Curated annotation (Swiss-Prot):
Subunit note: Part of the 30S ribosomal subunit.
PANTHER family on file: 30S/40S RIBOSOMAL PROTEIN S3, SMALL RIBOSOMAL SUBUNIT PROTEIN US3
Residue ranges occupied by any KH type-2 domain in the UniProt entry: 17-86
Gene Ontology terms for molecular function: rRNA binding; structural constituent of ribosome
BP term (GO), one: translation
NCBIfam families registered for this protein in UniProt: PRK04191.1, uS3_euk_arch
Keyword Ribonucleoprotein attributed: yes
The name this protein goes by in its record: Small ribosomal subunit protein uS3
Gene: rps3
GO cellular component, one term: cytosolic small ribosomal subunit
Alphabetical list of InterPro entries matching this protein: KH_dom (IPR004087), KH_dom-like_a/b (IPR015946), KH_dom_type_2 (IPR004044), KH_sf_prok-type (IPR009019), Ribosomal_S3_C_sf (IPR036419), Ribosomal_uS3_arc (IPR027488), Ribosomal_uS3_C (IPR001351), Ribosomal_uS3_euk/arc (IPR005703)
Length: 210
């Protein structure tokens, strides 16, 4: 039971750190993180399209992030490494954040979603699914998904092959949840796939934002 509580606590802490970094590093094209325990402390790998922004002038920003991770989140001797995302269009976290930013700038959700869908597919993705949840068109919250191509939906392939990302857009009507799933180029497709040749949009029956 103690072990279960430990893993739950660590998972919650990683989620909170991820949310913090997403807000702090949006302009860097933040694409997620990986936290690993080492004999010397805690190794934190930050994935970003623009590593220079994460590091900051003279390393100022990365030193500040290190201090916050240690003092605010309780990481033991955090050592931050920054890994460049070679193609941000194939990183679901980056695309979710960018789509959320587009919504916050006032771009209509359908226009923003289809633009993201085309850009991702044009960069070689085998498939993509975008799900927007919240008050998109009026008082009632609903969920709409946009999808195209080949996407593993269940089992181990869905966990290991598909890049997944989540972000939130803060609008006057409320919070819009943005989920993106991308099947990268070259992924070996299993039997459990959904085949959609053309872009499709559908409303998902739901009374609450995801």
């Amino acid at each position: 039971m103690a072990i279960e509580r430990y893993f739950i606590r660590e998972a919650v802490r990683e989620m909170l750190i991820d949310e913090f970094l997403e807000k702090e590093l949006r302009r860097a094209g933040y694409g997620g993180l990986d936290i690993k325990k080492t004999p010397l402390g805690t190794k934190v790998i930050i994935f970003a399209a623009n590593p220079g922004y994460v590091i900051g002038r003279g390393g100022r920003r990365i030193r500040e992030l290190t201090r916050i991770l240690e003092k605010q989140f309780g990481l033991e001797n955090p050592q931050i490494e920054v890994e460049e995302i070679k193609n941000p269009y194939l990183n679901a976290k980056v695309q979710a954040v960018r789509l959320a930013q587009a919504l916050e700038r006032g771009i209509h959700f359908r226009r923003a979603a289809y633009a993201a869908l085309r850009a991702i597919m044009n960069n070689g993705a085998r498939g993509v699914e975008i799900r927007l949840s919240g008050k998109l068109t009026g008082e009632r919250a609903k969920s709409i998904r946009f999808y195209q191509g080949y996407l593993a939906k269940v089992g181990n392939p869905a966990e290991t092959l598909v890049s997944k990302g989540y972000a939130q857009a803060l609008l006057k009507l409320g919070v819009i949840g943005v989920k993106v799933a991308i099947m990268p180029p070259g992924a070996r497709l299993p039997d459990e796939i959904e085949i959609i040749e053309k872009p499709v949009e559908e409303e998902v029956v739901s009374n609450e934002a995801e």
